[in-house]
Amino acid sequence: MNREDWTMKAKLLKTSAALAVVAALGSVSAAQAEDLTLCWAAWDPANALIELSKEYEAQSGNTMHFEFVPWTSFADRMLNELNSGGKLCDLMIGDSQWIGGAAENGQYIKLNDFFDANGISMDAFIPATVVGYSEWPKNTPNYWSLPAFGDVVGWTYRKDWFAEPQNQADFKAKYGRDLAVPKTFAELKDIAEFFQGREEDGKKVYGAYIYTERGSEGITMGAMDVLYSFGFKYDNPDKPYDMEGFVNSDKAVAGLEFYKSLYDCCSPPGMSNAYMGEGVDAFKSGQVAMQMNFAFTWPGFNTDPNVGGDKTGYFPNPAGPDGDQFAQLGGQGISVVAASEKQDAALTYIKWFAQPDVQAKWWKLGGYSALKAVVEDPGFATSQPYAQTFLDSMAIVKDFWAEPSYATLMQSSQKWFHDYVVAGNGTAKEALDGLAADWQATFEEEGKY
């Protein structure tokens, strides 16, 4: 199915479902109309959601307001809002790692009964997003959100630079293989070193952009994206919260050493505290051959006047030294805030958003739908140049702790990773030993032992 067929199918799906959607929302009369506020991060998908939500407003009579906060302060602002019982947000598209705290502290309403009453099945969504965004405790049928935006860390690369005949010849002469999308992290580093300092498009370029940001979650998302494939585990699979020899295993140490080596060898200058936005800027300005970033950035690259179209390619996280291949989960679910006085109206938004035709339009506008009916459609993989990479990446995801103590756990990893990778303090083993000790202390305070 080509893109035109995909677009036509989405239009037909929308038409066939329109009356059902209107009926589902029809119980909200003009006299009952509410002003609802949805809280999320300030990024391109949020703008797409504003556009998408116009249809909900027209059908429901409710008016949507939006509170969008930059990613670097999103967690602080919104977790404070939840912890204080604030009434700013009726709907929250909260980060995946917040689900444990929001559930256990009564900050989101449980959605099981609502889903059952309205025929919304979690089996209809990508399994990794249900576990990652909706379930608490994990791997139990207790749902606190509807998967709203599937996301994952992957890579973009300068397809045009890779294809340039002189680059192909020089790379093969040096490494004995074709210059192609890396299948392993070792291959990725070779490519990064090859491009480091090379001249492309008339200027000096750099090998690879990776996350280093200290203040929120940046370097943790980047380092974990690599450590998973090297053999890092959060704890003993047979003994929860038993971290010694798993967080700080020899394989995990090798992964953190690799991440630092990639930063030291091949990052652009001035990237010692950089996250998503800096990566976008570095790639669009032609500074780097490869760039680590969440999939939400890919539509913007595809349409960019400088790097769009055939100039940019996409690939999933490569494999580690033993063949393990994982990627850091991103993305969020949409929840109803327990402190809201407009819960019934907020639930009508979730019901509307869950409709297959709305999810198809969400993808078309630049949102990453987690609905199987969208992503498993035969036309999906070819509907955008990055669609197949998104599917491949979502099949290998892992995520950070989603415990109620998430913020404290994240602060520890941010400190230890940044101090070692960027500041060059101590060794990788010392960093992971320190991290394991900090995490153990946090869980001891929670009574996990």
Please describe what each predicted stretch is.
Residues 35, 51-128, 132, 165, ...:
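Extracytoplasmic "Venus flytrap"/periplasmic binding protein-like
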